[in-house]
Amino acid sequence: MAEMKQQIEAAVECTHKAWIPVFKQLGYPTHSLPINYYEGGTATTPCGTLQAPAVYCSANGGSLYFGSRLLRENSTSVIWIKLMVFHEYGHHIQAQSKLFNAKAKLPSGNETERRMEIQAECYATGMIRSDDSFALTEKNYQVLRKALQSFIDDGIHGSPESLLYWGMRGFHSESIGGCNTWVVGSEKVR
């Protein structure tokens, strides 16, 4: 478990350093995000008590939470760990760019939440492509595709088909704009 925590912390630090110039240019705060670990499947955060393997909380400038169950179940996959870290960091990008505020003005419901979650996953795969810390071989590419299709469709995080579509879109996109889930029809964010 200590090795997984090191991987998480290294991935968060590297990702944050990569985003600092963008945040500075846009006038966003650049402070480091606190990383928290919790036992079981429930995180207690300033945003409330949430049941999830990993959580981003936007309160107080943002913080990341990773559950012990996530670390034990996925301890053999570097790609899985990075996908989770980058997904949660994707929510930080959304919070920084005020997408959380804009979302609050939209009708509540699963589709609005799905657009947010699928966009974070799209960001995550773009960050994986840009991550030079491990080789993106054909084997790793297939592991990534399989990981995207392995999520259980809970109505909020997207169907395996949508996650694969947006995940590959983010992976192959030249810019973060390729992850704009807010301008497509409902059929693209199932």
Language-model regions: role of each:
Residues 38-65:
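Catalytic zinc-binding patch centered on the HExxH motif and its immediate surroundings
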Residues 109-136:
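Post-HExxH zinc-binding segment in Zn-dependent metallohydrolases
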Residues 89-105, 129-132:
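Catalytic Zn2+-binding segment of zinc metalloproteases
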Residues 1-44, 177-190:
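A metal-dependent hydrolase signature that marks the N-terminal structural subdomain at the beginning
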Residues 68-85, 110-112:
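Short pre-active-site segment immediately N-terminal to the catalytic Zn-binding motif
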Residues 129-190:
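Long, well-structured alpha-helical subdomains associated
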Residues 20-36, 102-103, 131-144:
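Surface-exposed patches in mature extracellular/periplasmic domains of secreted proteins
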Residues 19, 83-96, 120-121, 125:
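Active-site recognition of the HExxH zinc-binding catalytic motif
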